[in-house]
Amino acid sequence: MATVAAVIASTHHPFYYRASTSTGADRPPFADEWVAKITAFRETLTRARPDVLLMVGSDHFHQLWLDNMPQFLVGNAPFYDANWYNEEREFGLPRLFLKGQEDLSAHILRGGLDTGFDLAFSNELRIDHSVTCPIITLRPEADLPIVPVYTNIFAPPLPQPSRFVALGAALRSLVESWPADLRVAIIGTGHLSLELGGPRQFGPHGPDP
């Protein structure tokens, strides 16, 4: 059976990439502190020796919108196009092409039915910075297959917090029941230092707490 090699909660702050790669006067004063914190997370993931990354994030209205927003969605594709035009323009993020792990996706979708989750799926999912930024920060080689799981945190009605807790427990159980001799790292992503839709949305904020 598969093993949960690590569980990590990490930022998907879209400004990290530009801040960490800037030099001279363009480099913000908090960049070095930010890089040091991210390096510690990266070392944790490297020590775990994962074979697969199970990425739990959210779509920022790139592919899913107010009129079509599943509460919980699993990507089920052999490959994923990653990052959108506005993310390249606004944040300087590179376009990525990431390999999927379809066997684990299928196992989660089938097994989810027995754990109280009728999970939506997409065979044509294109992912955004909620998945790519943690890969850039924690696994910049981008060499591991992924399973993206999108959660609805934007379009009311939102799931209750208890459902997110239950989903986390279900994902762990499903990974551990997957009949594959592989190590899976589960990475939950988000950030606390931006005010989405508010006056501080694009302010000069540093590292997440």
Range-by-range predicted roles:
Residues 159-208:
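Active-site beta-strand/loop microenvironment that shapes enzyme catalytic pockets
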Residues 62, 155, 195:
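Flexible, glycine-rich phosphate/dinucleotide-binding loops
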Residues 51-57, 149, 182-190:
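Beta-strand elements within well-structured catalytic alpha/beta cores of enzymes
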Residues 105-147, 194-209:
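Catalytic cores of processing enzymes, dominated by hydrolases/peptidases
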Residues 11-16, 152-154, 192:
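Short connector loops/turns at beta-strand edges and beta->alpha or beta->beta junctions
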Residues 1-111, 115, 119:
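A short aromatic-anchored loop/beta-hairpin motif
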